[in-house]
Regions:
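Conserved glycine-rich cofactor-binding loop
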Residues: 7, 14-16
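Conserved mid-core segment of classical short-chain dehydrogenase/reductases
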Residues: 70, 91-109, 132, 152-155, ...
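Catalytic loop of short-chain dehydrogenase/reductase
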Residues: 92-93, 139-162, 167-176, 185-193
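Short C-terminal tail/terminal secondary-structure segment
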Residues: 97, 228, 240, 251-264
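Catalytic Tyr-X3-Lys loop
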Residues: 101-121, 135, 139, 163
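Alpha-helical segment proximal to the catalytic Tyr-Lys
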Residues: 128, 172-173, 248
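Short, small/polar-rich loop/turn modules that mediate ligand/substrate recognition or access, typified
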Residues: 175, 180, 250-252
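A glycine/serine/threonine-rich, flexible loop-to-helix segment
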Residues: 176, 189-223
Length: 264
């Protein structure tokens, strides 16, 4: 098993990506600790893991609340001897598709503050334990907006580019202590549209051009080298690999899972 007996904390554990990653982590032998704001979504994710024989615990924790995150991570570390993997899969619905003249400061800052604050808070909480124990893996999730240009992307672009820069800098800081940091950059995830905030967000963007959401998503797929969008299980499987010892020389990297929308 890739993650046998690893202690993995997943913030945003009730969301589409967090729950999918948790399922794979548990299958690969990790003891999974899901944290998020929605108890029903956390319970649903945990139920699926338990049905497959996996080990999982849940906690209602707002990743914007540094004290709450610290208390939860510290409690997990005390009870289980440390933190091996920390994944931030927290998501924020936000405005895309509008020109800067039509975008309010609040709408611009919402994803920037949300993603950068929660990743700082969760990484800091985990790093404290990982550096003390001499190893661990911190996983972050970006978007193609970090590399794209064009109308309607300023908030998304700022948060994604900022998160990728944060991840690289953190990898440099924590590397001497044996801690790896890997950022994963997927594209729009087709099978997450029906279960996450992205469905409504993509619908709003499509509506700006009077395009049905399904057609808009098909257009996104057509702009990739593989002529398709990535899927949740592909991202989850990669996250498990990146968290495992098989990727022990990988750090400071942004893994491109855009199906070829971005060519690095």
């Amino acid at each position: 098993m890739l993650l046998e007996d690893k202690v993995a904390v997943i913030h945003g554990g009730g969301g589409s990506v967090g729950a999918a990653a948790a399922q794979v982590f548990a299958r690969e032998g990790a003891r999974v600790f899901l944290a998020g704001r929605s108890l029903p979504r956390l319970e649903a994710a945990a139920s699926s893991i338990r049905a497959g024989g996996g080990s999982v615990e849940i906690a209602v924790v707002d990743a914007m609340d540094q004290d709450a995150v610290d208390r939860h991570v510290d409690a997990v570390a005390r009870a289980h001897g440390g933190i091996d993997v920390a994944l931030n899969a927290v998501g924020f619905d936000h405005v895309q598709g509008l020109a800067i003249g039509d975008t309010s400061l609040a709408d611009y800052l919402h994803p920037v503050t949300g993603y950068l604050q929660t990743n700082f808070v969760t990484a800091k909480a985990a790093a404290r334990h990982m550096t003390a124990q001499g190893g661990g893996v911190i996983l972050t999730i970006s978007t193609p907006g970090a590399r794209l240009t064009g109308r309607g992307l300023i908030g998304n672009a700022a948060q994604s580019a900022g998160l990728e820069g944060f991840s690289r800098a953190l990898a440099g800081e924590l590397g001497p202590a044996g801690v790896r940091v890997v950022c994963v950059r997927p594209n729009a995830l087709l099978d997450a549209v029906g279960t996450s905030y992205t469905g409504e967000m993509f619908g709003r963007i499509a509506a700006l051009t009077a395009t049905p959401r399904a057609d808009w998503l098909a257009g996104l797929a057509g702009n990739t080298l593989l002529d398709r969008l990535p899927l949740l299980d592909e991202v989850a499987e990669y996250l498990a690999f990146a968290a495992s010892d098989r990727a022990r020389s990988m750090t400071g990297v942004v893994a491109n899972l855009t199906a070829g929308m971005i060519v690095d």
